[in-house]
Amino acid sequence: MVIYCNLHTVIMNIFYNNIHRCFKDTPLHKAVMLPDAVERIRMFVSKGADINVISDFKKTALHYAAKKLATPEVLKTLIYLGTNVNVTDMFESTPLHYAVQENGLEATKKLLDLGADPNTKYMNGQTPLHCAAMVIPDGPELVRILVEYGANVNALDNKHNTPLALAAELSNTNKTIETLIELGADVKIKNNDGITPLHLAAKSSSDSKTVETLILHGADVNATCSEGNTPLHDAATSYELSNTIEMLIEYGAEVNAANSVGDTPLHCAARSRNPVHKLKTLIAHGSNVNAVNGISVTPLHLATYSDNATEALKVLIEHGAEVNSVDIYGRTPMHYISRSYSSQSLKTAVELLVEHGADIEAKNVIGGTPLSSACNNIEYDLRLIECFIEYGADINTRDIRDETPLYSAIKYPEIVNLLMNYSASTNITNKSNITPLESAIANCIGSAEIIVTQIILDAFRFPDIKNDAIFIRNMKTIEECTMLIDVKESCEYDINKMRSIKFNNMYGLDIFIRSNNINLLSSLVSNVEDIYLEPGCFLVYGNKLRKSVYAARKRLSLLKNSISILSNITTDGYWNALPIELKYNILAMLGDNDLFNIVRNCS
């Protein structure tokens, strides 16, 4: 019987103390929140359970009890049975840290009464007072209790942040901030990055009262961090729509203070989220809209990166921002738009800049235009590239390497295809005597295939080009690549098939990929049968054909509607007496927008 009892004790000890290897918690950990927790804890210990047994992350039952805000009697029992009140888990957190984090006023007070050290530090250097500073809503009471038991109100964590700094970084903690200051917190202590509590409050708080509280208790409104930012710089980057900027300026913040890279608060606001309100406020208080930083970048340059670029640009331009200002690399705001990652469509931003005189052909120090820059952007936006072209960007402009935007786009077949649709030159070389086709073969065969389709089409549209030395060189390059030979043959098949479909003695279906004369095409478009527009009919030039035919049909519809409307509303006998062909010729001199206005305004 004695042997059995001893064996039973050994087995139970193994069970109680090792069950956590299979499960996260031991029975002792689970017991702390049961109604009869004290009795169960005593029973487990009497059966051989280790009072200091740990679960995952090296937490004891006391850690669990503190985190789950167990009754003071449970905490007292665990400690009286042998748990160290300042025991730490794998994160070096004590039970007191957990009690404070969980907003546990009663548990916190009990642990302190039982000897918990209010200045013990978590692995990141934070004391329970740091934790209390971030607790809502009982932060002020927790702070008072901890300081009453000896907590250092200016304790520093591993980043040199005080409890006041952590409170300032959160919203809705002004009462906690007031309590900390009342108990001796220093408002001027900087962390390792030179950041003061006022910097943090200016950037994070939606309540300007927090900012005012810190200033009224001695915070330096123009204090600079290691990057040279003042609290006003930080407020300008904040997403919050608050009165913080006005509050800082009211208390003496320098609106044109420059940080270590030369950015003013207006620079920061320009590139921030939700910038419009902040820009207007700063400008109203004297911010220089044409201030330049260390590389001559203005707020207008940076506004192109905002999530509301168009509105930000509009505010700056309305207040005198120079739309063609250049940085030290010769880049204008239009260049910056070409590299913007804004989630907003940038077409309206381009329209706004052009409307106010921005040079869409401006060149940077290496001769690159906004178009060439956009074509060399790994996160390219086809709509933006097309917008540049539609607003007059020269598709064949050359940089100092004698390269056109096509060279910049070689790695991106979608961009190459777009440039081909606008007839970018292919029979050219750069200063290294390399053609776009040769560059594409070396970098992206998909782009090479697209370029071949344009080379063959150009030869069809402009027969004289066949005598050009670079064209001959391109054709030789094609013949040396089996894959490109197949593309060439497919191109020629499409062209010959279109040529075989005749409308009359002069024109066939091929005119729609050969000519850009929209009036000529609109006069012939009624001959085009829908079967020719089906996706499988022309594998190479089908898209180009469809685009041309649809544009011609739209043009014809506008012409017909305009003639009909003018015939119905005019009392001029001369107009009605004109032959229909002459009416077409007269209206054909108008653009699509003019015809659309006739239809819209006279209907």
UniProtKB/Swiss-Prot annotation:
Coiled coil in keyword set: no
Pfam families reported in the protein's UniProt record: Ank_2, PRANC
Keywords: ANK repeat, Repeat
Ranges: ANK repeats: 23-53, 57-87, 91-120, 124-155, 159-189, 193-223, 227-257, 261-291, 295-325, 329-362, 366-397, 401-428, 432-467, 504-533
UniProt keyword Ribosomal protein present: no
InterPro entries the UniProt entry points to: Ankyrin_rpt (IPR002110), Ankyrin_rpt-contain_sf (IPR036770), Multifunctional_regulatory (IPR050745), PRANC_domain (IPR018272)
Gene3D superfamilies, alphabetized: Ankyrin repeat-containing domain
Protein name stated in the entry: Putative ankyrin repeat protein FPV162
Organism: Fowlpox virus (strain NVSL)
Biological classification of the source: Viruses, Varidnaviria, Bamfordvirae, Nucleocytoviricota, Pokkesviricetes
